[in-house]
A protein has these predicted regions:
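Conserved alpha/beta cores of soluble small-molecule-handling proteins
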Residues: 1-174, 178-181, 208, 217-289
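Glycine- and Gly-Pro-enriched alpha-helical subdomains that act as flexible
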Residues: 174, 181-203, 209
């Protein structure tokens, strides 16, 4: 059965789901998106993702002609039409179709697409062994050039960092900001643990305010684990006891090697495993969200 894709209010089979070559999302990466996760038919922290989508759109002067509730219903409609319970969903909003050119005045209405695909998570073996990461040369675009709070369709900065990481046999890149501080991964936020203290870059480091990042910070505080948002240089990662990255799809993923050097024992740390277990209690519905 072909995947059904939601385009501007209509569900279409994958082979019929088309967007104009004059769409500014295609021409310029001019738009915003969110990646969401469904567990047992419930979209996790859906409202938080939609809030960020609307904030991103507003920041680049795109007016979404629907309410958050309407988009939420559209997400569930797409999920159910594809008979999915455990899935990831990609919600994209472009500025719409216009004649080529940078002027945004000729766009009558945005283009809205939703893709839902079955996803039950990464293999358990990855969480048991951890992933390799690499500090790369590609720097995070500074906030003065592009607001990091905007989850933009133009992902070239992240793609080039991931290319570097892949060439270094790493699954994720550690991107630095222009001041040389640790910023974030290509699709994740970064946390390190040293002597029982959890540290993660602050939003002022030029990072996206990840939904999973916020949940993890709250979980740490609720469970009496000290956590600070503080800038740090990559050298601290090499001497950390533990390291992990967070994202909608990663959840809480241990990082056990950075540029070929073991983090701590080279195995997922106890605190990382505890946070992953607490997070999965949320996704399993054992605590309200």
């Amino acid at each position: 059965m072909l995947m059904l894709i939601f385009i501007n209010g209509i569900l279409l089979p994958q082979d019929q789901a088309k967007v104009s070559v004059l769409d500014r999302g295609f021409l310029y990466g001019d738009g915003v998106f969110e990646t969401l996760r469904a567990y047992s038919g419930t979209i996790f922290h859906c409202n938080d993702h939609l809030d960020r989508l609307f904030q991103s759109a507003e920041a680049i002067y795109i007016t979404i002609p629907f309410t958050p509730d309407h988009l939420k219903k559209s997400l569930y409609k797409t999920l159910e039409a594809n008979h999915l319970k455990d899935a990831y969903l990609r919600l994209s909003v472009t500025r719409g179709v216009s004649e080529p050119g940078l002027d945004i005045g000729g766009c009558p209405s945005p283009t809205l697409t939703i893709i839902a695909k079955g996803f039950s998570g990464y293999p358990d073996s990855l969480y048991q062994s951890g992933i390799h990461a690499a500090v790369v040369n590609t720097r995070r675009i500074p906030a003065s050039a592009l607001n990091p709070a905007v989850k933009s369709l133009n992902f070239l900065n992240n793609i080039m960092a991931r290319v570097e990481a892949t060439r270094l046999n790493a699954a994720e890149a550690v991107m630095l900001n222009m001041e040389g501080y640790v910023a974030e991964g290509t699709v994740s936020n970064i946390f390190m643990v040293k002597d029982g203290l959890v540290k993660t870059p602050p939003l002022s480091a030029g990072i996206l305010n990840g939904v999973t990042r916020s949940i993890v910070i709250d979980l740490l505080k609720e469970n009496g684990i000290p956590v600070i948002e503080q800038a740090f240089y990559p050298d601290e990662l090499y001497t950390a006891d533990e390291c992990f990255v967070t994202s909608t799809l990663y959840e809480v993923m241990p990082v056990t090697f950075i540029n070929g050097s073991a983090v701590g024992s080279g195995q997922p740390g106890k605190l990382t495993q505890m946070i992953l277990n607490l997070f999965r209690r949320l996704t399993a519905g054992k605590k309200s969200y």
